[in-house]
């Protein structure tokens, strides 16, 4: 029973972190989209900011994938403990 509680807490923590990452990615995407539109229409845009946002967005994508994999592993372990 103790292991189930530990896994539940870990799953909840990872899920909250995943939601934070999704929120950050959403904010970044909006900013990237605005800069991308300026770039595509030939208007002046902050190239350094754009590249920085793209890099950070890719890092968040990798972190998001890792968290999803971790949550899936925890869920699998959780159900194995239940059985």
Outline where the language-model segments fall.
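Long amphipathic alpha-helical coiled-coil segments
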Residues: 65-83
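Glycine-centered signal
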Residues: 6, 13, 34-35, 59
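Non-transmembrane coiled-coil alpha-helices
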Residues: 14, 25-28, 60, 67
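Short, charge/polar-rich alpha-helical segments
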Residues: 1-23
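Short, flexible helical or helix-coil boundary motifs
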Residues: 36-39, 61, 78-81
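Short E/K-rich amphipathic alpha-helical oligomerization segments
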Residues: 19-55
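Short amphipathic alpha-helical coiled-coil/interface segments
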Residues: 53, 57-60, 64
């Amino acid at each position: 029973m103790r292991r189930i509680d530990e896994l539940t807490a870990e799953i909840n923590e990872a899920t909250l972190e995943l939601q934070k990452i999704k929120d950050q990615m959403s904010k970044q995407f909006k900013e990237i989209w605005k800069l991308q539109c300026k770039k595509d229409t030939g208007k002046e845009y902050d190239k350094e900011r754009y590249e920085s946002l793209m890099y950070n967005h890719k890092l968040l994508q990798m972190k998001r994938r890792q968290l999803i994999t971790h949550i899936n592993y925890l869920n699998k372990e959780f159900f194995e403990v239940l059985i």
